Amino acid sequence: MQNLPVTHYSALLAEKQEKLTALLAPFNAPNLQVFASPTQHFRMRAEFRIWHEGDDFYHIMFDQQSKQRYRVDNFPIASELINRMMTALLPLLKQQTVLHHRLFQIDYLSTQSQHIIVSLLYHKALDEDWQAAAQTLRSQLQQQGFNVQIVGRASKQKICLEQDYVDEILRVHGKDYIYRQVENSFTQPNATVNSKMLEWAVDCTRNSHGDLLELYCGNGNFSIALAQNFRKVLATEIAKPSVAAAQFNIAANQINNLQIIRMSAEEFTQAMQGVREFNRLKGIDLKAYECNTIFVDPPRAGLDADTVKLVQQYERILYISCNPHTLCDNLQTLSQTHRIEKAALFDQFPYTEHMEAGVWLVRKG
């Protein structure tokens, strides 16, 4: 991974386009819209194990085929900010034993707005000595011009020197949106391609009538940008830090038609069908929503059979998938009632087999 095959990028993307086109062919999908990535420095987060060798230590990764570890001194797929931090950080950690003793992993989360969180993970409890040393480390990095947050983590322990989040700014069709991103919770890794996904989703849902339901909304990445196209938006998310970030993002972007509820897709299905009542829904009148459109961005496993049935009840379905094979499994059912109006390939993960796909489905007839 040290030297990227930048000159082969276009050919590698064309291969993905062929593969996804073939996968979607049985469902009569229209021609793919293809959204390319920058060829380097596109990844806004990275995680590395730390290997100790005598008094020395360094970042390592593991080869996916051979499982052999290899040393990483620079990482061209990661943002330039992460690369600069990797170079600056290790010499400073080496100055203080309490900071590198039993350190086994470092996670980096950066933003286009030049903020970064460094998370230091340890096989030991963290005490006041660690905290004092970490404060010194942060000051040293700030003196080098870094806008940095430091988080220490150990078993059942987390210490934030100031905060455990960064605020990213993403541009969508010329408008800037603020997104709070919390350390150790999911965020889209490729900021440039994320903006393109948001723009595509906004374009698909333009001129929509009624309301939008989103399952698993995370920090509100999609629902905040999509709210402009709907009367009201109802979004579900199960992870507490993501819900808190989403609530901040709603306020920061002055969105007044988006309601987030903390429940799983399965629980939401039960609530909609009146199978059971939830205290979390007190004060929210589900009957006041006329959701004609549903948005889903499921994990790699795709949607389970019950959720597919729920999704099928909606007139229009916007489906973003990080695994086209499980997308196609779901389309076996969805294509019985819906047709694909638009399809897209988003190259979130250049130089890998991974493909991010989007389909916009409309009910037949």
From Swiss-Prot:
Reactions this protein catalyses: uridine(54) in tRNA + S-adenosyl-L-methionine = 5-methyluridine(54) in tRNA + S-adenosyl-L-homocysteine + H(+); uridine(341) in tmRNA + S-adenosyl-L-methionine = 5-methyluridine(341) in tmRNA + S-adenosyl-L-homocysteine + H(+)
Protein name: tRNA/tmRNA (uracil-C(5))-methyltransferase
Family as reported in the entry's similarity comment: Belongs to the class I-like SAM-binding methyltransferase superfamily. RNA M5U methyltransferase family. TrmA subfamily.
UniProt keyword Thylakoid present: no
Taxonomic lineage of the native organism: Bacteria, Pseudomonadati, Pseudomonadota, Gammaproteobacteria, Pasteurellales
Residues holding S-adenosyl-L-methionine: Q188, Y216, N221, E237, D297
Entry's EC annotation: 2.1.1.-, 2.1.1.35
Residues annotated as the enzyme's active site: C322, E356
